[in-house]
């Protein structure tokens, strides 16, 4: 019976399970082989299985070894790279956009990068100073308070000014320049010129009526003279000395009788209510007013009239003389026509004169 059982066990087939899809890994196949060999009888099978497992372990150890060749680094400061920073970020597992773009000069170890970063930061500061608004210092102060840089979180007391404000005040200086605290920073792109003209502080009651209820205790000046501001003096036509002399002088003093025209230059007709400008040109009053409504310059020479048209005395005198001469000639002609002398009387008068 024992011999029959031994022969039956020796003739029993070995069952091996295989996957239908995919290739079986090396570890699985070696395990199945070890199971099959261990199921066989005899000490030779166990020793064979032990040797197979040792060889597979040595093969797996030799296959997992990775050799990395180190690249040679040159000490040239002109050669720059960001490989070390990228490798460090990849190992830490945080590859964000800000970390990829930021390159630390100390980590890279390049001398040229330090100088270029300093130059770029200075240029950026100049651009910010030129483009910032007038309340940039208040904005930075607000951000510092929000971030808690000036707070007493570390236990060190820094005074009442460093207290953290959790409520946003309306009068923070950023919303309106009229309510801002402290001086306003001047813009760098716009240049302004300010002209300040102070009021004379003259007592209005005393100037207009000559009486003030406050008497000597009035804080305003008691003077009835005319006080004008700077812009009012500039508007006046006689503000300059040259213009004042031109106004005080008579424009018709230097004119002779031959220089006086006999007709208006605008309407080309005889004068009707003639006027003269400061530049000694004669026009009709209606023509001069119509011309001034369209253009304030003189029609003859193009100088500024200033709206001053004086009565032309010499033209009026000349017109009166012409009228008197015409009237006298008309009178003489009329008298001569009314009292004609006969021809024989003229002849006898001539004969008597000859004798």
Swiss-Prot record:
Any GO MF annotation of the entry: zinc ion binding
GO cellular component: U2-type spliceosomal complex
Gene behind this protein: CWC24
Annotated region described as Disordered, given as residue ranges: 1-81, 94-137, 330-355
PANTHER family: RING FINGER PROTEIN 113B, ZINC FINGER PROTEIN 183
Protein purpose: Involved in pre-mRNA splicing.
Zn finger (C3H1-type) start-end: 197-225
UniProt KW Cell wall biogenesis/degradation keyword: no
CDD domains, alphabetized: RING-HC_RNF113A_B
Superkingdom of origin organism: Eukaryota
Record's keyword annotation contains Amino-acid biosynthesis: no
Protein name stated in the entry: Pre-mRNA-splicing factor CWC24
PROSITE patterns hit by this protein: ZF_C3H1 (PS50103), ZF_RING_1 (PS00518), ZF_RING_2 (PS50089)
């Amino acid at each position: 019976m024992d011999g029959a059982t031994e022969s039956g066990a020796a003739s029993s087939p070995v069952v091996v399970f295989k996957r239908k899809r995919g290739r079986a890994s090396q570890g699985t196949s070696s395990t199945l082989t070890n199971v099959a060999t261990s199921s066989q009888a005899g000490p030779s099978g166990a020793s064979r299985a032990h040797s197979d497992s040792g060889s597979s372990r040595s093969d797996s150890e030799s296959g997992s070894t990775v050799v990395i060749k180190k690249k040679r680094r040159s000490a040239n400061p002109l050669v720059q790279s960001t490989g070390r920073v990228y490798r460090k970020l990849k190992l830490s597992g945080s590859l964000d956009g800000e970390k990829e773009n930021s390159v630390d000069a100390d980590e890279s170890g390049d001398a040229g990068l330090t100088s270029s970063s300093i130059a770029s930061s200075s240029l950026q500061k100049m651009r910010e100073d030129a483009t910032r608004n007038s309340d940039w210092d208040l904005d930075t102060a607000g951000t510092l308070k929000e971030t808690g840089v000036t707070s007493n979180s570390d236990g060190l007391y820094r005074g009442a000014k460093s207290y953290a404000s959790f409520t946003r005040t309306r009068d923070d200086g950023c919303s309106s320049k009229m309510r801002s605290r402290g001086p306003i920073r001047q813009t760098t792109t716009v240049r302004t010129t300010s002209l300040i003209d102070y009021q004379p502080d003259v007592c209005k009651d005393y100037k207009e009526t000559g009486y003030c209820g406050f008497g000597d205790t009035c804080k305003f000046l008691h003077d009835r003279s005319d006080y004008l501001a700077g812009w009012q003096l500039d508007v006046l036509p006689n503000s300059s000395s040259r213009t004042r002399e031109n106004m005080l002088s008579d424009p018709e003093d230097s004119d002779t009788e031959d220089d006086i025209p006999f007709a208006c230059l605008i309407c080309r007709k005889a004068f009707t209510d003639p006027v003269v400008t400061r530049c000694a040109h004669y026009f009709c009053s209606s023509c001069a007013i119509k011309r001034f409504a369209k253009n304030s310059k003189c029609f003859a020479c193009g100088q500024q009239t200033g709206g001053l048209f004086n009565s032309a005395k010499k033209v009026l005198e000349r017109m009166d003389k012409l009228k008197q001469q015409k009237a006298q000639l008309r009178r003489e002609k009329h008298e001569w026509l009314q009292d004609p002398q006969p021809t024989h009387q003229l002849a006898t008068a001539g004969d008597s004169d000859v004798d």
